[in-house]
Amino acid sequence: MKNWKEIIHHQTFRYIDHSTQTDIEGKPNTALTSFAVDDTLAISVSEETSPPVIRLWVHSKTIVLGIPDSRLPFIDSGMQFIEQNNYQAVVRNSGGLAVALDEGVLNISLIIPGGKNLSIYDCYEAMVRFIQAMFHDLTNDIKAYEIVGSYCPGDYDLSIGGRKFAGISQRRVKNGISVQIYLDVEGNSNQRAEVIREFYNKGKKNMETSFTYPDVDPKVMGSLSELLGVALTVDDVQKRVVHTLEKLSDEIVEIPFQEEEIVNFKKRYKQMVKRNESN
């Protein structure tokens, strides 16, 4: 496995903060838009028309679904529950299962080249190490292993004391790699987990399925603020991202979407809309 600093260290990093932006190229800044943006940036990084990217994004109440979630036997009941609780639903184009987003959850996309020579595990490990470095002054107890009972469980769940606060997914476009992580920073993590648990209850109704959906236990989830005993905000964590990135690059630049990126974004946005219409 490659050293994580070798994977992330680049002379120049492009920094994009979409956390408070209301629209992107004329499209409302929703989670659907975010996945199209990351695909666009992965293409640019792959074609070397952009340096590697760190992008920050935050969305109001959204349940991001995986493709298996869209195949629940009673998905209409699950979707109705989501809407009744004032969440919108988006089916993502990367791996994983349902995740709850709101203003207390910071999403970070690390978009780098190397799709042909970096393994999936190399990239997951690099993100784990990056997050550990971000909070090294507060804790050395961030671990990566599957937290049974969490939503969107996986080998690279991030937890403190056995309670999960983050999950990682990954998507590859050409030679570009987008490693995405959600960080539960502040707010009611228990309520987020309850919504996901009830979504599965409504969508499955105890029916036997060939796919194993998680049996969500809100007690195994937590926010960073709660787990660290520090009143962290999303803004605080954004500053930590930049501070850590400064140690891994010679310069950080902010570049708006270029002409070709706008073209690619519109194409990828249409694909995301179509994906969500067909699910």
Swiss-Prot record:
It comes from Oceanobacillus iheyensis (strain DSM 14371 / CIP 107618 / JCM 11309 / KCTC 3954 / HTE831). The lineage of its organism: Bacteria, Bacillati, Bacillota, Bacilli, Bacillales. Its EC number is 2.3.1.204. It catalyses: N(6)-octanoyl-L-lysyl-[glycine-cleavage complex H protein] + L-lysyl-[lipoyl-carrier protein] = N(6)-octanoyl-L-lysyl-[lipoyl-carrier protein] + L-lysyl-[glycine-cleavage complex H protein]. SUPFAM superfamilies: Class II aaRS and biotin synthetases. Residues 48-253 form the BPL/LPL catalytic domain. GO terms for biological process: lipoate biosynthetic process; protein modification process. This is Octanoyl-[GcvH]:protein N-octanoyltransferase. The active site is at residue 152. One of its GO terms (molecular function) is lipoyl(octanoyl) transferase activity.
